[in-house]
UniProtKB/Swiss-Prot annotation:
GO terms for molecular function: electron transfer activity; FMN binding; oxidoreductase activity, acting on the CH-NH group of donors, NAD or NADP as acceptor. By homology with NorV in E.coli, may be involved in nitric oxide detoxification. This is Putative diflavin flavoprotein A 2. Pfam families: Flavin_Reduct (PF01613), Flavodoxin_1 (PF00258), ODP (PF19583). Binds 2 iron ions per subunit. The gene is dfa2. Its cofactor is Fe cation. Residues 262-404 form the Flavodoxin-like domain. Residues 39-233 are annotated as: Zinc metallo-hydrolase. Its EC number is 1.-.-.-. It comes from Thermosynechococcus vestitus (strain NIES-2133 / IAM M-273 / BP-1). In the N-terminal section; belongs to the zinc metallo-hydrolase group 3 family.
Amino acid sequence: MLTETRPRDVQVAEIAPGVLVLRSRTWDRLKFEVEYGRQQGTTSNSYLIQAPQPALLDPPGESFTQIYLQELQRHIDLNQLRYLILSHVNSNRLATVKVLLEKAPQITLVCSKAGAVTLRSAIGEQLHLWIARADTPLELGGDRQLMFIAAATPRWPDGLITVDPQNQIVFSDKLFGAHVCGDSLYDEQWKKLDEDRAYYFECLHAAQTRQVESILDRLAELTPPPRLYAPAHGPIVKFSRSRLFQDYRDWCQAQAEQETKVALFYASAYGNTAILANAIAQGLTAAGVQVEAVNCETTPPAEMQALIHSSDGFIIGSPTLGGHMPTQVQTALGFILAEGSQTKLAGVFGSYGWSGEAIDDIEQKLLDAGYTLGFETLRVKFTPTATDLEKCQIAANEFAQALKKLRKSRTVRPSSLAEAQVDRTEQAVNRVVGSLCVLTTLPEGCFHLTQAAAILVSSVSQASFNPPGITVSLPQEWAESLCLVGDRFVLNILKEGSPLVRQFQQAQRLGEQQLATLGLKSAESGAPILLDALAYLECTVESRMNCGNHWLIYAVVESGELLQTSGLTAIQHRKTSS
């Protein structure tokens, strides 16, 4: 998190002959929306192409309008500006566009066909418009021209990517960016950007990976290949082009490989419902669920129908317009009610100005049809607040966990032998809370049970139910060498009054000679099970958290057994944990 509090400014630099970047910078969190959650500040990047017929790309939003236009006029007479290219249109950017048009009414606006509809609705029919097409370059005079790639996604249905073939620059808008503010123009320290880039992708693109992959395919066909990616936010991508491009491929593939998929249907009149949808999508993604965002205003009906059948659950969001849901949402809801399975989990959310009838109507129709809701319906009046977005993420996590549990319950029942093992494991897990345990593991290169490492632990808790999981606190030096992610161990749960308790309390780690005096048998992993323990669990380390002089280990329980049917679990009575 940034602690720097410099005032907002506009950084200007030349990134290629005749191409300037104007980076409107803020070191504070620009908005409360989830995508800015890492609180690293951000830049809003605009680009000026100095040609016989100059073109300006993507002016920033309203909070930068004044300082941006002041800086822009130091580099061009606005009366000479010929084209204003908009990679996407939103209400925030429109505020700056309107001021520009007042100062330079001769400007021709360049956008996608969908963007033109928005512009005419917001500004009027009198606009000078040029609709970008993939097969038609925009001539800037001399040997300068720009090409275009359609980049429509559910979140930005009017998306447009601009290509400068002469300088080999791709003006990638929302692709390849990061919400990071700094003095570095380029990504020289690109390794330090990994987490910010991944978070940016998760928030903006994880729910629309199908469309992102299609755009990546078109970018891969560019000849010659790009020298720079010039995104809307963060550093210009120069030193990690191939790496970041492959990261986007990998992140898209990772979403497609998730076992559970949710279709997120929504329409948004003023952007508020879309903000809620984005927060829900991010929460689902963080919970390990594949999300397919469906903007009902732009998605073909056949595509909606296919998603209803292929998804494990669905969530539908709507504004309220004149006391009703928009026609596009009615269409999606109609498909769900007519073709959806009532065994699938559902969810409802929306924004409204006065009464919110559309949200109530959707909820009631789904309940009447026999659907189960995965979270309490979310109703937000006017513009969502930070608290509202937090509620969206909590609801999304609830939905994801309920969906996974529902999916698990519908799998084929195991054989009687497997059922018996599940029952034994459950009985053993029930003994874990607050107990004294001995953790044993067989180090690499060791083959005999008496060579195992063992340690007494008391900070043990059940952390998850499906799959069963536990957390264990271990000393740093022990965890760093013997409990890495993927390692397996046995947690031997001790019985109250057992001599094992005293024996292990006297020595935090047993040597080979001491283990040799105990009754042992081998678990599947090779680690020893103490035959005099009350129960045991065989576990695999799934994740770790550094907590200073200790590590907190989360492990999934693979098997276990109650070794003694009577007796109480040994409890640590002193206040400090081992």
